[in-house]
Amino acid sequence: MIQKYTYGTPFETDAIVTSIPTSEGTPAYGTISTENGFSFAYDMDDNDVVYGLGESNRGINKRGYVYESNCSDQPNHTEDKISLYGAHNFIVISGKQTFGLFVDYPGKLKFDIGYTLSSQLKITCEDADLYLYVIEGETPYDIVKQFRKIIGRSYIPPKFAFGFGQSRWGYTTADDFRKAADGYRENNIPIDMVYMDIDYMEDYKDFTINQENFPDFEAYVNEMKEKGIHLVPIIDAGVKVEAGYDVYEEGVEKNYFCKREDGSDFVSAVWPGWTHFPDVLNADARAWFGQKYERLISKGIDGFWNDMNEPAMFCTPEGVAELKEYIKDNFMDKEEAPGFTLGDKVNALANNPEDYKRFYHNVNGQKIRHDKVHNLFGYNMTRAAGEAFEKIAPGKRFLMFSRSSYVGMHRYGGIWMGDNKSWWSHILLNLKMLPSLNMCGFLYTGADLGGFGADTTRDLVLRWLALGVFTPLMRNHSALGTREQEAYQFENIEDFRHVIGVRYRLVPYLYSEYMKAALNDDMMFRPLAFDYTDDAFATQVEDQLLLGNEIMIAPVYTQNAKGRYVYLPEEMMFVKFLPDGTISQEILEKGHHYVEVALNEVPLFIRKGKAIPVADVAQTVKDINPATIRMIGYEGAEYDRYDDDGVSTL
């Protein structure tokens, strides 16, 4: 059962697609106050578990820390960070009482889950203008499925998007991208996509191509497609301020950019220099910006990734002026050294909270200050693209994922987990985010395999790939200036060929399970506790996940480990894809086990009485031969495999 409570005058986020009447009175759970903003307080038992919050730090059970829904350009995903790129305000409390909460509020929202008081869950925000949805069900899984029904169907990508992709910030010329593609093809390592970061553009201007590097971009796109490679360019949120740049001039002429309070176009520095932000919360501006994707689609592009759309800001003219004044007042003509405060002031120029209060959106003729609806920007930038795709190429699927998001964006694209680091702990963080994101409708997701920032290691890339084999988005991505981490850069390339090849062997299963989850408003990845509800120990397990209804995954995420401990809540078949192409299968009883997993092996566990389809390796998704599909798992088990043309919208 779902009940909706309305407080004040909420902003319509379009997160919910089902019409639900407002209930009278107050929720049956917790205590609500609307004095000095909004607060919800609930007393937890010691054994209560709290799930959800989508893309957020720490564990699957969110107890013991504080989190903010405040879409942030945050490249350091350490445990102290309380907000990342997304705002996913859905939680499920499981224990003495089991219920779910979705707080439909587009500004900054704080979840104190046993941080200030270990027994109290407290949700607070500045304004008492929101919708609160209270969902009751028998189990957390039941509650999630009810929530998924009211937020709409998850985005469905083209089938090629389930292949492997290579990316690196720093690829600039046609030869750079060609070298990456050829490096995989020449070493017989399967690949479907090469991603284009910001350097393909002319001066970092959206919807442009550097003509010197790509004199005939359409021919280049076709050249890559002949190799079985889809090029996937990045689009950023900021439009460069430059006379003669038509996107800029059109936006200014039609008042499609976010405004300062005085009505002038708001200015912020991002990659191109000074930029304006398209007012994607304005329906006309959103349609205008979305239509610009056609410029690249007309050249043969069929996939994009949206970035910097929290929106990220390096600085603003106002912030720079304030810094200059501070330096003048405190350090000019003075003999003493500046001290650390000057450094803090300089660092505070980027993504300064005060700057998010300096600009406004025009929504149905109403001027809305940005910080009040901050978490909707990335969502609506990707919505702009998704709505435009339906008009530009009706009936065709496009690959699309974003960095920033809010519940509702899951209908238009996926997300990647942002600028992680080449740290072993981030394999585990990647794993733990998967079910939380699925709870909020984000099925097409994955991390930068091998790590984006910092220098990676061969063993880290292999272990991370062995998790990435299972995530819908499987992409190796790294930052400018870091160690090159394409699979062909390391010794014993055959190990990478094998591990990535396992992905292609599993595509018949992974695509089928993704589509079942999308079409049935379900989860692809689940915590063990969602299925094994009577198993108290399963609630404690956070480094193993159920994938679909047939398998459990348990990656190795510790350097120098020869294997790992696993807990089996029932008898399962331990399966390893071995480097010689064979598959080992061993029945293990319910309970605790240590399993050996070499660096060049990919493990999974098949649940009792189940089986999954496995194909032969192919170099691209479209080259997977259905005639080679066979079943592995328990003898006599059946599997209902979903398939389609992988291109047409549903």
State where each predicted segment sits.
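Catalytic and substrate-binding clefts that recognize carbohydrates or anionic sugar/phosphate headgroups
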Residues: 1-158, 168-170, 174, 181-186, ...
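Extracellular structured ligand-interaction cores
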Residues: 37, 85-89, 96-98, 106, ...
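Catalytic core of carbohydrate-active enzymes
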Residues: 38, 63, 78, 376, ...
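Glycine-rich, histidine-containing beta strand-loop boundary motifs that form or position
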Residues: 42-44, 55, 94, 102-105, ...
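Short, hydrophobic/amphipathic alpha-helical packing segments
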Residues: 66-71, 84-87, 178, 286, ...
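A residue-level signal for conserved active-site and pocket-lining positions in enzyme catalytic cores
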Residues: 90, 147, 184, 224, ...
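Short acidic-glycine loop/turn motifs at beta-strand connectors
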Residues: 92-97, 260-262, 569-570, 579
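Aromatic- and carboxylate-enriched substrate-binding clefts and catalytic-loop regions
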Residues: 190-496, 531-532
